[in-house]
Amino acid sequence: NVFSGVKKGADINAGEAWDITAGDNRIVVAIIDNVVKPTHPDLAANMWVNEAEKSGVAGKDDDGNGYIDDVHGVNFVKYQYDGTTTLTENLSDHGTHVAGTVAAVNNNGIGGCGVAGGTGKGDGVRLMSCQTFHEIPKTDPLYNVWPSGTDTCAARAFQYAADNGAAIANCSWGYP
């Protein structure tokens, strides 16, 4: 039995919570992980948008925060090495998976329901992608780790998230 050993009532009571609210688009949740794919069909409507960068000039830091074209967040790994901030996809999509748990759009007939994904009317929490991990093939003789990130990347991500309105940071980190 898949439920053997599970404590009765140990769920999150999502149904009861959704009777009060299913999300709030004024709340920004930073996903500090690998990339959150901003075009994912179950996440796109709930992605945080840096309006100054979205409507600004490509290749320019339109909002003056030190990061160029950070429309949905920043790739802190790339920034550390080459100064660019473009979000890049990974093989595992862990950040996208985590973001779906938080705020996949509810009631849209796609995928699953996020805990704070809203009612399907654009009222879910906003997801900010703070990419702090990247994937290095295990065959790489220098690193032999997967995924990889640095304390510097994480610290920059927390600072960026706080400076740009995130009230919550999700850090689904671990190691073997």
Placement of each model-derived feature along the sequence:
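Primarily auto-inhibitory N-terminal propeptides
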Residues: N1-S4, G15-W18, Q159
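Extended interaction regions within the primary functional domain
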Residues: V2-K7, I31, H72, G174
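Alpha-helix-centered segments that form part of catalytic cores
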Residues: G5-D11, D93
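Subtilisin-like serine protease catalytic core
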Residues: G15-D151, N164-A167
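Aromatic/hydrophobic pocket-lining residues that form the small-molecule binding cavity
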Residues: A154
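Short acidic, glycine-rich surface-loop motifs adjacent to enzyme active sites
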Residues: F158-P176
